[in-house]
Amino acid sequence: MIRQLVSGLVVAGLVANAGAARAWDPTVERQAQAAIAEFKKADPSIEAFFDEAYGYAIFPEITKGGFGIGGAGGDGAVFEQGVAVGSSHMSQVTIGLQAGGQTYREAIFFKDKAALDGFKRGDFELAAGASAVAVKNGASKAAGYERGVAIFTMALGGLMFEASVGGQEFTFEPR
């Protein structure tokens, strides 16, 4: 009962915050730069994505939790040709068999200007079936873009069992 109550409160907080645009925060950019260094340290082959992508969004810490109904959320920085151009908020609501909580990083690479512009306009949502590559040494060598986007995640902590459905939604706020 207590676990369900705590999970419900976490989900309610995440959902209430889901569509909130975030003002530019230099702390998030610093955290994103540190996350970029950690991605590269964990898998040096990911450097090619940072070098060749037109832009990318880096979410240094996404928190996810649930028990039956779940949610996730986190703030990140958006870069265009290596320069920070704005901030983003990711939110997700999931329904299905799930229990636990975890934190992770997420990097979304945009192959070209059109893909990044779609993200900035709000025309971007990761569907439930979108695939992300878990960053580990050499994993990004075999990864590629799908519809102009490549997604990588890096676990930070926690344990989550899930067989659930839910997509990620993003907001963008220019710098």
What is each residue range found by the language model?
Residues M1-Q4:
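Positively charged n-region of N-terminal signal peptides that target proteins for export
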Residues V6-N17:
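Bacterial N-terminal signal peptides
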Residues N17-A23:
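Sec/Tat signal peptide C-region and signal peptidase I cleavage site
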Residues A23-R175:
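Small-residue-enriched, tightly packed secondary-structure blocks
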